[in-house]
Structure formats: C-alpha cells, structure tokens
C-alpha cells in the first residue's frame, strides 16, 4: 500500500513538471474537450454550450457540435467558421443527434451527411464518378455544387461497343459549353478522342463508341446550379441496330466494326443501292494496234463486255502506245482511263556513262527543193503564200519512258574534255522508227600533254607513265621487309584498263613464270621517286590479269612485252591519260633518224641519298642505232648479243641535254607526230626498255628496246 501511494505521488509530480514546461496559453489541458483532435483548438475558455447547425435553406436543427471557442472579442465563433460544423450545401439530409455520453463522429471523422443526393457520395457528399463494368447501367447526377469535377469510365466486354442515351440534361447553357458541361470521349481516359461536349437542357442523340470503352466527364464552374443529368448505357454490337438494308447480313470483324453482305441485286456499304444490270460497250483497238481481253469475265456479246473485264492494248511494229495500257469496265458501266493511241516513235539508243545527251526542243524540219525555187519565180509572193506547203504538225501525246517522238533531235557530247567522241554528234528520230547517224561513244584522248616536253624543261609530267610495284617475298638488300612494295619498272597506260609493260618486269628472273597478280600493283599519276612525296591525286590500282606474249624468250629477252589488265578503271584527268599506239603507216622510213623520248624512274636509287626526296621522273632524248652497229659495240666489250627484229637499239643523243640513264631507269620510249584522229601532234608508244649492259651510263653501249609496233594488233586484242 505504501508503495502504491508513493507511485501515485510520483505521477502527479511528473504531470506538474510537464504542465510547467508548456507555453502559457496551453498550460492547462482541458480534459473536458472531447478528444485529442480538439485540444489544439481549445483555449482556456473552452465551453460546453451546444451550437446548433442547420442545413442550407432550412430552419430545423439538424445537428449540433461542441465545443466552440471564443474569439478575441470573447464571442463564440459561428459554427460555419470551424470545419467541424461546415455542412455541404448538397446534403439531402443531415445527421441528427446531440453530444452525448459517447464521442459523435460528426466532426472528428468528417462525416457530415447521413444521405447524399443521387450521384454523390462521401461524408461531405462532394465525391462523384466511378469505373463502371457492366452490360448496362446508368449515370445519375442529381443537382450539383459549384466547381464540381466528376469522371466516369465505362468498360464493355471485348467485341462490344457502348451506346449512351441521355434521359435528362439540365446544365447551364453556353454556345461554347465552357462553363457547366458533360464531355464524352471515345476511349478510357481524358486524352481519348472527344466525341462531343454537351450543355443546356436539350438532350443529344444516342452516342456510340468505336471501341469497348467510353469516358464521361462532368464539370461545373463557380456560379449557378442546375438539376444535373441522367444517362443510361448498354453494351451493344455494331450489328445490334441492324444497319444493313434490304435484308443484308451484318458481319462483325475483329475490331468491332461491321460489313454488310448484300443479297443479289444490291450494293453499297449498307446494301442501300439497287444494283442495275450494267455493262460496257466494246472498245475498238487503236489504229496501227490491237486490243486483247486479259482479265475478267470477258464479252457479254459482240458489242458489250461484262463488268470487271480488263482490256490491254498493243501496237504494231515500230509504233509505240501513248496512254493507258489497260482499261477496266467499271461498276457504273464506264471504262477507266482514256483510249490510247499508237504513235510512230524511236526507242532511245543506249549510251555509255561517258556520253552526255540532250534532247533538243521540238522543231518541225523542212527542206527547200528546186520546186520551191520554181514556184518562187513563177508566182507572185501572195500566191506563193497561199499555195505554200503546209508544215506537218508537231506530234502529240505522251510516250513511255525511253521513247522519243518523230523528228526529235538528240545531241551528244562527252562528259569530260579528256575524252573525244566517236559517232554522230546529233541524231534524228526518222519515220522508220530508227535513228539517223551512228551511235556515239567516248574514248579517252591519247598522247596529249599540257606542255610540249623539252630537255630544258624540268618537271614535265607524262600522264601515261605507269609505275609498276612488286611485293617482296623476303628480306631485301635495301632493307625492305617482307610484304613491302618496291618499284621495279615503268609501263604505259594505253586505255582505262590496260597497261603495256616489259615482260621481264612481271616474271621470275630468267624464267617465263608469271608472278601472282596479288603481288603486283600499278600506280598512276606518280611524279616523285619517293613514295612519301606522292600527291593525293595518285591512283593505286590492282591488277586482275597478266597477259604474257606467247613468244616471250626469257633468255634472249626477245618479244619482251606483256599486258596488265586492271581490276579497277583508271580515272582520266590532267595527270592520268593514255598514250597512242602507232601504226606502220604512222612510222615512216625515217624512224631510224627519229629522236625518241624515254621516260622512267631511277629504280636503283639509294633511299639514303640526300637527293632521293627530290628525285622525280627522268626523261631524255635518244637516237636509234643500227642493229649491226649495236651488236658490234657489245662484241668490242666482250658481250655477244643478238638484236632481233622485235628490238631496236638506241643511245643518248649527245646534241640534247638529258638526265636519264636507261640502264638504271628502264622506262618507255615515245615519239610525237600527228595522228589519224587529230592533226595536232600526239605522243605514240614505240618501245619499252628491255636490256642494257652499260653499268656506268657512259653511253659506250646502246640500250635495247622492245619494238611496240609489231605487237599493235596483239595489244589491241587484249585491250578489249
């Protein structure tokens, strides 16, 4: 007992300490306040008087609330100020009762109304809207407060759509329906496509969704109240309303849409049209052509064809169809398209990518004959004008792509100044359906350079000079490692895909064994000996085939000539152009007295030499040496040689300065003289450096060249 007393005294002491620690106006907790929710609102003057609450517009007491605190003027505040006594205007009936022995939930839990008007729910009757999943039902909103917002989402079963009918509509009217309104959307949310927005009191027509859901939104603004609205909904199918006329069968598809299967004699989306027995009159064939039924049911009789018949048209000989190739007999008894005609025309000739064509504007051509001159002298000018020959009319009608009208002229030119045209520059479409003249083509201009070379001119570029590189198969004495490329010879470009070179450059030493094409490449547009100084404009081309002359002798180096076929076409430019091939008629008997230009790179140059970086393509003049004299020169040096008919010897011309040593550079030999294609001088390939025993470049021994002229036909056969 003593222990219990001391415990109670301890609790009282603790309570006094807690009270002394609170702020002044909250120092006393009024235990009479009904629950902790009220304590924060209660002052020391908290009263127990009951405050009566009334429903809006009514005088009878419908509820009470306590306590109510006094304000600064020591007056009891109105119950409407405190949220515990605010009763929503739309309550259908308010909760009755007084503060009794038990705690009423009138204020504390927020339940103010016992019953709400239809469509509203919640303790304050302010909540509305819901998700509806039913085959049928209703949406009823009895009256509505200010600033209300309600949403309903109606879901139907898959394969069904929703029909919504308004039984009553009483909202504030506005032409734009922007104050109080009901908005219906075709979907399940407020972002779905809107069907329509309604206001006022005029009931709308029934509304149908396209899918299985419908969204209904109600909104009211801050003024005026009306009676609300009432709508019923039900699940239906697109066929529920029997949309097909004349006993047509309504068929549903997977999307919920419908199609009507019409009975015989009816047509239309809903079988609403009576199908008349129609047909099309027979189409005649075009002049200089004929027709053929290619699809559909075909002829009804000799003069008519059935609906759905397709007729195709064709032309005879050199005539071309202008207009629709096919026409179809349509449901209305009319033919599709327009009747075509057969016209004389020419198919455009095929041209290469190097040829540019231009169709000239249509002009009717006429010719003056002796008869015209006779009339001009025998008759007066007036009579001549009256009796003048009428010029034919210009052709009409569109032609298929790739055809041109009669008398059309087409002009041709090469796409680049580095090419020259062969064939006609202008061709005319004749009445026979053929083109006048010869088909044009463009070939590269050969043997032309920007400036005439001279031994005194430094830096002359020879655009047909081809550098032949070979890939190493082992360690080279010069420090080249396996797989590195090194310059072995010079060749001559003779067309976009062909290079002529000495055969010993592309075979194993002393053998007729051809090296692999993968171990060979051709570089065009090269000028400097050092590969690092080459311009970006050079072209590195792969080799697709190596054609060795069948009579090549690897011991005597007789017939020392080969053709390289390029895998990729050379791009013709100022730096890359072919050289011409000379004919027997071009080379006169004065060939022995000719001054021949030889060009090539120093293939034996030392890469460590100070001048290697600036070393360029060398060239110089040589003169032809008599074959017997050439053999005697070598015999005097103890070197027996044979100069065959496929060779010629030449040595440096002492009368002209030169920087070339043919024994070190190899290279190609060329002559400049007017060719058959142009009176201007053109450079022609006449020889390839084959062999030389002049180790010191002292000109004591002549260099042997392979003659190109005897192999011209063989080269041209392999150029194709």
From Swiss-Prot:
Cellular compartments annotated: Secreted
Residue ranges of domain CUB in the record: 128-236
Organism: Mus musculus
Superkingdom of the organism of origin: Eukaryota
Domain Peptidase S1 per the UniProt entry, residue ranges: 445-720
Signal peptide residue numbers: 1-21
Keywords: Disulfide bond, EGF-like domain, Glycoprotein, Repeat, Secreted, Serine protease homolog, Signal, Sushi
InterPro entries on file: CUB_dom, EGF-like_Ca-bd_dom, EGF-like_dom, Peptidase_S1_PA, Peptidase_S1_PA_chymotrypsin, Peptidase_S1A, Serine_Protease_S1-Domain, Sperma_CUB_dom_sf
Family: Belongs to the peptidase S1 family.
Protein name: Inactive serine protease PAMR1
UniProt keyword Kinase, yes or no: no
Name of one Pfam family that matches: EGF
Gene: Pamr1
Disulfide cysteine pairs (residue numbers): 128-150, 177-199, 239-250, 244-260, 262-271, 280-329, 315-342, 414-442, 489-505, 630-649, 661-697
Main location: secreted
Occurrences of domain EGF-like (ranges): 235-272
Task of the protein: May play a role in regeneration of skeletal muscle.
Glycosylation: residue positions: 614
Conditions for induction: Down-regulated in dystrophin-mutant mdx muscle cell line.
GO CC annotation: extracellular region
Expression sites (tissue/organ): Predominantly expressed in normal skeletal muscle and brain. Expression is enhanced in the regenerating area of injured skeletal muscle in mice.
ATP-binding found in the keyword field: no
């Amino acid at each position: 007992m003593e222990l219990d007393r001391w415990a109670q005294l301890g609790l009282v002491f603790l309570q006094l300490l807690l009270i002394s620690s609170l702020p002044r106006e909250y120092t006393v907790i009024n235990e009479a306040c009904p629950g902790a929710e009220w304590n924060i609102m209660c002052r020391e003057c908290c009263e127990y008087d009951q405050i009566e609450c009334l429903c809006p517009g009514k005088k009878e007491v419908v509820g009470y609330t306590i306590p109510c605190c006094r304000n600064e003027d020591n007056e009891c505040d109105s119950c409407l100020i405190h949220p515990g006594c605010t009763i929503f205007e739309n309550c259908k009936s308010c909760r009755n009762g007084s503060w009794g022995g038990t705690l009423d939930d009138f204020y504390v839990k927020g339940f103010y109304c016992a019953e709400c008007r239809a469509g509203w729910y919640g303790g304050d009757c302010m909540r509305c809207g819901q998700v509806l999943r039913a085959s049928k039902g209703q949406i009823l909103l009895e009256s509505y407060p200010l600033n209300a917002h309600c949403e309903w989402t109606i879901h139907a079963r898959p394969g069904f759509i929703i029909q919504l009918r308004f039984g009553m509509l009483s909202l504030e009217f506005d032409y734009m329906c922007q104050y109080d309104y009901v908005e219906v959307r075709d979907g399940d949310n407020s972002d779905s496509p809107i069907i329509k927005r309604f206001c006022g009191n005029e009931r709308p027509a029934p509304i149908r969704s396209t899918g299985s859901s419908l969204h209904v939104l109600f909104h009211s603004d801050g003024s005026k109240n009306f009676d609300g609205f009432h709508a019923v909904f039900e699940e239906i199918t697109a066929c529920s309303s029997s949309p097909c006329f004349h006993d047509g069968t309504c068929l549903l598809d997977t999307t919920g849409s419908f199609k009507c299967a019409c009975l015989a004699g009816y047509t239309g989306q809903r079988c609403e049209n009576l199908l008349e027995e129609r047909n099309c009159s027979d189409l005649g064939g075009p002049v200089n052509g004929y027709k053929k039924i290619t699809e559909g049911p075909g002829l009804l009789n000799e003069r008519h064809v059935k609906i759905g018949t397709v007729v195709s048209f064709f032309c005879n000989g050199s005539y071309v169809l202008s207009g629709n190739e096919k026409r179809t007999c349509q449901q209305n008894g009319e033919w599709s398209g327009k009747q075509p005609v057969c016209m004389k025309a020419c198919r455009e000739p095929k041209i290469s990518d190097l040829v540019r064509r231009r169709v000239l504007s249509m002009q009717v051509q006429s010719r003056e004959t002796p008869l015209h001159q006779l009339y001009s002298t025998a008759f007066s000018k007036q009579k001549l004008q009256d009796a003048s020959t009428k010029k034919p009319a210009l052709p009409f009608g569109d032609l298929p792509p790739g055809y041109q009208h009669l008398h059309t002229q087409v002009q041709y030119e090469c796409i680049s100044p580095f090419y020259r045209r062969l064939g006609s520059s202008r061709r005319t479409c004749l009445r026979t359906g053929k083109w006048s003249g010869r088909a044009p083509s463009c070939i590269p201009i050969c043997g032309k350079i920007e400036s005439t070379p001279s031994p005194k001119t430094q830096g002359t570029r020879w655009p047909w000079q081809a550098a032949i590189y070979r890939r190493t198969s082992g360690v080279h004495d010069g420090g080249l490692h396996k797989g590195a490329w090194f310059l072995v010879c010079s060749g001559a470009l003779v067309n976009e895909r062909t290079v002529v070179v000495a055969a010993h450059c592309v075979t194993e030493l002393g053998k007729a064994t051809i090296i692999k094409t993968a171990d060979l490449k051709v570089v065009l547009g090269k000028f400097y000996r050092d590969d690092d100084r080459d311009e970006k404009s050079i072209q590195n081309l792969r080799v697709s085939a190596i054609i060795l002359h069948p009579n090549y002798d690897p011991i005597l180096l007789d017939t020392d000539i080969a053709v390289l076929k390029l895998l990729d076409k050379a791009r013709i430019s100022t730096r890359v152009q072919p050289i011409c091939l000379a004919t027997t008629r071009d080379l006169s008997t004065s060939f022995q007295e000719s001054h021949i230009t030889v060009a090539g790179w120093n293939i034996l140059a030392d890469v460590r030499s100070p001048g290697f970086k600036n070393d360029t393509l060398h060239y110089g003049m040589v003169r032809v040496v008599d074959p017997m004299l050439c053999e005697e020169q070598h015999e005097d040096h103890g070197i027996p040689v044979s100069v065959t008919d496929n060779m010629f010897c030449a040595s440096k011309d002492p009368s002209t300065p030169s920087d070339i040593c043919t024994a070190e550079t190899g290279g190609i030999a060329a002559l400049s003289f007017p060719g058959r294609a142009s009176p201007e001088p053109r450079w022609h390939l006449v020889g390839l450096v084959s062999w030389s025993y002049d180790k010191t470049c002292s000109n004591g021994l002549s260099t042997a060249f392979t003659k190109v002229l005897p192999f011209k036909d063989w080269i041209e056969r392999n150029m194709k």
